[in-house]
Every structure is written in C-alpha cells, then in structure tokens.
Amino acid sequence: MSEREVSTVPAGTDMPAAKKQKLSSDENSNPDLSGDENDDAVSIESGTNTERPDTPTNTPNAPGRKSWGKGKWKSKKCKYSFKCVNSLKEDHNQPLFGVQFNWHSKEGDPLVFATVGSNRVTLYECHSQGEIRLLQSYVDADADENFYTCAWTYDSNTSHPLLAVAGSRGIIRIINPITMQCIKHYVGHGNAINELKFHPRDPNLLLSVSKDHALRLWNIQTDTLVAIFGGVEGHRDEVLSADYDLLGEKIMSCGMDHSLKLWRINSKRMMNAIKESYDYNPNKTNRPFISQKIHFPDFSTRDIHRNYVDCVRWLGDLILSKSCENAIVCWKPGKMEDDIDKIKPSESNVTILGRFDYSQCDIWYMRFSMDFWQKMLALGNQVGKLYVWDLEVEDPHKAKCTTLTHHKCGAAIRQTSFSRDSSILIAVCDDASIWRWDRLR
C-alpha cells in the first residue's frame, strides 16, 4: 500500500436517496433546504456567533510573539482558485459543527458528504453545475442531542459505507446509509465527544476524544473498547481534537489544557491489545474484554500555544495545530534533526517551523482541514471568510494563500471538507448554512 492509499469501496454501494431517518424514535420533519443555484435565492443571516460554551477570552499576543521559529509564513498568490457555486441552509437554524466528504468511494461514484449540527445528521450528493442534492437526514430521538463531529469508514465485510457521529451526549452512533439504519452505538465517555477519527489503514479502529479528558480507541467490528488514553499524565481538561499519522502508528491529541500529546499505538502492548480485540468473541466467553489504560503519553508539550488547542493534524512527521490565536503553527517534537520515532517521553524541546496567519478567528472549536493528498489546507474564520493555503512549496515560508469570500456568507465557518479529488470544497457555518466552492481548473 503506497503512503497515501486508502482502501476503497467496491461498486454497488449507491445510497438510497432523500429519506429522513430517526436515530431511535419517532419524529416527523423534513429538512426545508433553501438551496438554489441562483445566488439571490439564498437566505443567509449573518449574525452573532453561536459559540460552544466557555469560550476562552482571547488575550492579545505577548510582545515579541511573532518572532517565533523562523517568523511568519508570508503568503504569496496561491495557484488554486475556487468559485462559489451554491449554498443552502438547513431548517433547524442551529450551528453546523462538522462536515466530511466520504473519501472511501470509488472514482466515478457520486461525491457524498455528511453534515452534523443540532440533533441532525444529513447526507448530500454533489452533482455537476453546482447542484447539491439531499440524500438522507437522520434525527436523534433526544431533542437536546447536539452532534459535533462525524467520520466515514466502510464495513470490511459488505463494503457498505458507514458514518460515525457523536456530540454533546457522549454517545457514538454508527449509521449505515445503505440500509438507512443506526446499526450500533457506543456509550463509554463520561461527557461530550468533540472529535471522531478512523484509522487510516484499519477501517474498524475508531478514535474518539472527549470532554471527560480522555481518548478512547474502539474496534467497531467486535464492539470492543481497545484502550483509554488518559489519567495520570493525560489531558487535564477537555480533549478537543486528535489525529492519526498516515501509517496509523501514532496519535497526536490536543485540548483545553493548552497541551499536545503523542500516543504511540504501534507499541507491543497496543498491537497486542488490537489483535486481542479482533480475537474477542463474547459468545465464547463470559469474561468482559479488558481495555488497556494508557496513563502516560509518549511526548507532551505546552510550548506551542497559550490557549485552547482545538485542532491538530499530522503533515508527514510534522504537526499542524491551532488555537484561538489567529495562526496555524507547523512544528515538530524535539530538535529539527530528531527522528519522530525516537523521541523520548522526557523530551522537552519543540521546533517551530512556521505559521499560517489569518484574522478574525479567535473563538474556539474552529477546525481546519486538508485535501486527500495534503496539498491544500483550508480554514474558515468567524466572519465567513475561507483561507486556502497551497502546501506544495519547497519552503514552507512561501506557503501561498488565497481567501474566498461571498457577500452573503458572514457566519462563523466551523469546518471545511475537500472532496477526495479536491475539486469541491464545502464549508459549514453557525447559521446552518452550507457553502459549495468548486475549484477552477
């Protein structure tokens, strides 16, 4: 398997269209989507930002802060250009916190993405000429549920796409859009779940991070909790984000305690735990599966950010992370020449390689994304502006940026997602609006 290869789903998994499903009880409503290719038909009110509670006060940067690492990454003209071709609005009018394209589809399959917000999960299909078609909508039985995050995978037996969703109630739900059912759910976290991620090479390994200060690794094939990361040296406050590296050997997590922590899952102990989770069969034993409790991260730092760290992603062996300080920081544990796999837990050095600067993004829970090939980086701010950086540059100082704005998009953009072929960028906002930007070739 080449470095950036993800197993794809065979054909024959087209999703049934335009159905509204209940996640567990009866509820009748149809999403009234004011989507139209005609700009003037789009109703978007830009208003106050609905922040997730307890937003930290954003303290101005301390003097001399900008001389970090090798200084600012000056933005030159980006080679990518996008055009806004459509927007629509979900009828619940609550913030949409998450959006994800399904990257497990085959070439030629329709481009499907999911949005989450309020107690709603909605699936859409992108068509030519900017059309966004509603496929399915799911409503949680609890009106107080608020979904924050979603992640796609596929069933390794049937090849059906699967969507995991979670939020304020701390329950992970797995939805099969082919059968249009919530096929399983996991309860374990003691509080809200802020992010879900599937392992890049094993479609059954699901990582969840929570307000309960811990990360959990689940095997959704055998319904086992493989490990809990947290405790003695774990996060001291909500975990807000985490990411697997490309090979799925390491996890980097971050949270409200301003820290970033590295957890290796290719250790003997963890490899064994994952193997045992596959071997476990509750029908053949009375004993419950024993989950690993990982109290000590393999590296930890609080030297990158001075506020809540709400998004982290691997870029090769480097880390991209952001706080509510108007910059995404590119850094690595240890010194420049150190091998990431030889970093010791006692390592106190970090090397900051540069920053992607932007403005008006000082509320928390605003997440950036990259395209499949990690050639582009996208982030929205709290006044509806999108920043796209070209990562394909020799020198990161020369990272080129393009900003995308539309006069009717004025609400906070919570998350963005690129289609697998990078042709479409979707942004979701606090006013329940969805914006489609198509890349101009």
Swiss-Prot record:
Location(s) in or outside the cell: Nucleus
Residue positions, PTM N-acetylserine: S2
Pfam families: WD40
SMART domains per the UniProt record, alphabetical: WD40
Annotated positions of the N6,N6,N6-trimethyllysine modification: K66, K197, K268, K284
Highest taxon listed in the record's lineage: Eukaryota
PANTHER family (alphabetical): POLYCOMB PROTEIN
UniProt-recorded name of the protein: Polycomb protein EED
Species annotation: Bos taurus (Bovine)
The encoding gene: EED
